[in-house]
UniProtKB/Swiss-Prot annotation:
The chain crosses the membrane at residues 26-46, 55-75, 100-120, 140-160, 198-217, 238-258, 272-292. InterPro entries: GPCR_Rhodpsn (IPR000276), GPCR_Rhodpsn_7TM (IPR017452), Olfact_rcpt (IPR000725), Olfactory_GPCR1 (IPR050939). PANTHER family: G-PROTEIN COUPLED RECEPTOR, OLFACTORY RECEPTOR. It is a multi-pass membrane protein. It is found in: Cell membrane. Belongs to the G-protein coupled receptor 1 family. Coiled coil: none annotated. This is Olfactory receptor 11L1. CDD domains: 7tmA_OR. The gene is OR11L1.
Length: 322
């Protein structure tokens, strides 16, 4: 009987998309472009909402926090993915891997709760417009935002702690582009049954409950839209809410398929593609869907741009004169 390699793993190697060697350069350009657009779009939202006088309603407070979250959420995984595409296999230390895992779970859970509260906010704004200022005031909005962040922070601790206590011996190659829960549990040489059950229950508690809390208000919104007598008003409102619902469904659908209902028959490469949707694609779509289709927000962007351009012009003119 051959002796088993029980040496403790101190670092991991992320394999990424090594089976697509001929597409590495193209994938790098695509992911880099998406990452840059995501950062720019969300930073624009944060800047415009903080400076726009008409954008201080609860809806835009939620949006500002969502954009701030998306910047960090996508930065947790994408830079390492880009480095992986350039080096064909990125090494990451054990502590850095656990840190990435924690921030991924923490920010992902926070986004779930934020999306649920934003759906409730949209429900009140559309279905109870006259009572909306009294029901969703800035104090309540601030408390809901704090609840989202605090719940996300606490949610990230348990999975990260349980994974960090597992033994990793011998193999250190993670068949993924970031330190995710399923591939780490597959790599461990410990018994992971309790860890799997705990993460499964936690995934149901966060993903499924938040999904139904997000979906519920949109059901009432759709029924309210169908009662709007104006065809143009109904079409415009339905288009906006339909876009929100499409992005929410994409985000939750891919997450649930990975953590609540994983298929043992799916190839690791398919799981990586599914992961791309909730780590790369949805952070890009959120600023487009929630803000750039909004008339008030686009007007605020134009005002901020005119103000910034005016300041730059006056500064350059003053330097030229002196």
């Amino acid at each position: 009987m051959e002796p088993q390699n029980t040496s403790t793993v101190t670092n991991f190697q992320l394999l990424g998309f090594q089976n697509l060697l001929e597409w590495q350069a193209l994938l790098f350009v695509i992911f880099l472009l998406i990452y840059c657009l995501t950062i720019i779009g969300n930073v624009v939202i944060i800047t415009v909402v903080s400076q726009g006088l008409r954008l201080h309603s609860p809806m835009y407070m939620f949006l500002q926090h969502l954009s701030f979250l998306e910047v960090w959420y996508t930065s947790t995984t994408v830079p390492l993915l880009l480095a992986n595409l350039l080096s064909w296999g990125q090494a990451i230390s054990f502590s850095a891997c656990m840190a990435q895992l924690y921030f991924f779970v923490f920010l992902g859970a926070t986004e779930c709760f934020l999306l649920a509260f934003m759906a409730y906010d949209r429900y009140l704004a559309i279905c109870s417009p006259l009572r909306y200022p009294f029901l969703m005031h800035r104090g309540l909005c601030a408390r809901l935002v704090v609840v989202s962040w605090c719940t996300g922070v606490s949610t990230g601790f348990l999975p990260s702690l349980m994974i960090s206590r597992l033994d990793f011996c011998g193999r250190n190659q993670i068949n993924h582009f970031f330190c995710d829960l399923p591939p780490l549990m597959q790599l461990s040489c410990s018994r992971v049954y309790i860890t799997e059950v705990t993460i499964f229950i936690l995934s149901i508690a966060v993903l499924c409950i938040c999904f139904f809390l997000t979906l519920g208000p949109y059901v009432f919104i759709v029924s309210s839209i169908l009662r709007i007598p104006s065809t143009s008003g109904r079409r415009k409102t339905f288009s906006t809410c339909g876009s929100h619902l499409a992005v929410v469904t994409l985000y939750y659908g891919t997450m649930i398929s990975m953590y609540v209902c994983p298929s043992p028959h799916l190839l690791p490469e398919i799981n990586k593609i599914i992961s791309v949707f909730y780590t790369v694609v949805t952070p890009l779509l959120n600023p487009v869907i929630y803000s750039l289709r909004n008339k008030d927000f686009k007007e605020a962007v134009r005002k901020v741009m005119r103000r910034k351009c005016g300041i730059l012009w006056s500064t350059s003119k003053r330097k030229f004169l002196y």
